[in-house]
């Protein structure tokens, strides 16, 4: 009696229990710092499973002695997670009272295509700084080829950002938004 998840109708308790078990396995095996749910879990009917997963993840992290976060799109987790905005244009324009993150591709597509139009390193740095000043962050999506290699033009953008962070990183890391 659950709404569609990833286009499959309806979701049975057996399917959702299997999903929960697989998520717990990933948590146990890899102890991730960040668990990111892209889409497909936004339905309120899935809240019992999501709440158990969040409880398990945060309690596990406590025992590991590390801080972790869940990140999700839309309102999948109304509280206790970092809200994700897909693409820079959807990011908050003012300082938000909650942490958030934009996932934005290095180019005009999330995957690799021939002739991918890339953002400039300066534009990406500007977005990163703007996001941080508004209580947000930037998750930059790169677009490797099918063999896993990162094209040279994308590598150069990443190196340029890396050089900038090496010089100005102190002004970025540990920075928090502040209203005057």
Residues covered by each model-derived region:
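Mature catalytic domains of secreted/periplasmic carbohydrate-active enzymes
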Residues: 1-180
């Amino acid at each position: 009696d659950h709404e569609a998840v990833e286009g499959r109708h309806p979701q049975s308790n057996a399917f959702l229990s299997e999903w929960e078990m697989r998520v717990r396995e990933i948590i146990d095996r890899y102890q991730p710092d960040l668990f990111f749910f892209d889409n497909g879990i936004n339905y309120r009917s899935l809240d019992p499973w999501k709440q158990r997963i969040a409880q398990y993840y945060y309690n596990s992290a406590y025992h590991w002695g590390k801080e972790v976060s869940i990140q999700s799109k839309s309102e999948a987790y109304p509280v206790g997670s970092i809200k994700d905005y897909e693409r820079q244009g959807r990011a908050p324009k003012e300082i938000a009272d909650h942490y958030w993150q934009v996932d934005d591709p290095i180019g005009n597509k999330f995957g690799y295509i021939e002739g991918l139009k890339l953002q400039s390193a300066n534009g990406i740095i500007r977005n990163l700084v703007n996001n941080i000043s508004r209580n947000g962050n930037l998750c930059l999506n790169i677009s490797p080829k099918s063999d896993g290699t990162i094209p040279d033009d994308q590598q150069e953008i990443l190196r340029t950002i890396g050089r900038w962070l090496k010089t100005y990183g102190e002004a970025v890391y540990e920075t928090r938004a502040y209203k005057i």
